């Protein structure tokens, strides 16, 4: 019998308890949906939470936003690569875009996940509810915001997320933790 879902192991770095709580709740919810076959319309992606407030200057490119987690994905016991996509709300509600459109995470990558973001906003904006003279030339991603998502290489199968307590539970890799162009030009 072939597997019916991908397994995504998530390790939260730096003992960030609030971030770990968010992932724990999400994992339990997604696991329940898959185990109980609650819905045939299971989401393709697993949202990632921004671990800190991040300000991204207007008209700036390739701003690295660390996600505070490390992951590995398997399908049928074999390690699998996976994708990092923007959530639809990023395009609809923010001036942000992924610099490389889609992040491809190799099966052997075990480093911290991150997103390279461009801020296409050219206008200085007044912050809502702030003094009329307060003008900002950046966009703020707030701690806990969901801006990107992990998707499996085959969107037909859902992702079963598991929160792990030890980085070693992600599995061994020759590749290691170098990312963003580290394997060559």
Model-derived features: positions:
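DUTPase catalytic domain/fold
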Residues: 1-185
């Amino acid at each position: 019998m072939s597997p019916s879902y991908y397994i995504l192991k998530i390790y939260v770095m730096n003992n960030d308890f609030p971030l770990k709580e968010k992932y724990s709740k999400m994992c339990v919810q997604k696991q329940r949906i898959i185990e109980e076959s609650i819905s045939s319309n299971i989401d393709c992606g697993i949202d990632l939470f921004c671990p800190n407030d991040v300000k991204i200057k207007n008209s700036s490119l390739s701003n690295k936003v660390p996600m505070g987690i490390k992951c590995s994905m398997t399908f049928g016991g074999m390690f699998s690569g996976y994708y990092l996509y923007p959530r639809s709300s990023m395009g609809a509600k923010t001036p942000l875009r992924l610099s490389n459109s889609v992040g491809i995470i190799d099966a052997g990558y075990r480093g911290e996940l991150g997103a390279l973001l461009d801020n296409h906003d050219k206008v200085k904006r007044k912050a809502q509810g702030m003094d009329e003279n307060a003008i900002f030339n950046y966009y703020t991603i707030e701690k806990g915001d969901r801006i990107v998502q992990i998707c499996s290489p085959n969107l037909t199968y859902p992702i079963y997320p598991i929160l792990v307590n030890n980085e070693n539970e992600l599995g061994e890799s020759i590749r290691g933790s170098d990312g963003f162009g580290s394997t060559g030009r």
